[in-house]
């Protein structure tokens, strides 16, 4: 439910979101957000301290986004998260930006690749909703 509240915040900031987007590195980002200026944010969702400690794949995400955030519930202390990331405190109904993430502008080829991945994943998911039986693997 952290993802739902976070997506609501991102939409209020002018972003469209997609969950579980496969990245060129082979990893999957919890939430990827894209705005009309082409900015790409990745949000890694953490539900516990153990979740953060056990999962270090987020370090790979920075090369695929302009800004990297962690979203978590108010039960977790902010101090456990890396200092060079943004922090979003969320629940099932909404979220607020605790601190902004520093910007690391993507190179143009990476931005294009990520934008195309975002668009293709979104279109495929819509097509599966419209025609669930007519969608085999490409």
Predicted regions located by residue number:
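Surface-exposed, flexible loop/turn segments at secondary-structure boundaries
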Residues: 25, 39, 51, 76, ...
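Catalytic cores of nucleic-acid endonucleases
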Residues: 47-91
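Non-catalytic C-terminal interaction segments of nucleic acid-processing enzymes
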Residues: 1-19, 25, 80-138
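Short, flexible loop segments at the rims of nucleotide/cofactor-binding pockets, characterized by
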Residues: 20-22, 44-51
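Active-site beta-strand-loop-beta-strand hairpin of nuclease catalytic cores
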Residues: 29-42
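Short coil/turn segments at beta-strand junctions that form active-site/ligand-binding loops
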Residues: 13-15, 39, 66
């Amino acid at each position: 439910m952290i993802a739902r509240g976070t997506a609501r915040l991102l939409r209020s900031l002018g972003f469209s979101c997609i969950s579980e987007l496969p990245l060129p590195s082979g990893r999957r980002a919890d939430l990827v957000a894209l705005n009309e200026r082409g900015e790409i944010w990745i949000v890694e969702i953490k539900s516990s301290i153990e979740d953060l400690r056990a999962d270090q794949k987020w370090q790979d995400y920075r090369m695929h986004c302009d800004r990297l955030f962690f979203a978590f519930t108010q039960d977790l202390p902010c101090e456990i998260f890396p200092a060079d990331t943004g922090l979003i405190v969320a629940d099932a109904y909404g979220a607020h930006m605790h601190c902004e993430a520093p910007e690391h502008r993507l190179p143009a080829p990476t931005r294009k690749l990520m934008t195309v991945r975002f668009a293709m994943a979104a279109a495929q998911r819509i097509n599966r909703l419209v025609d669930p039986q007519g969608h085999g693997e490409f």
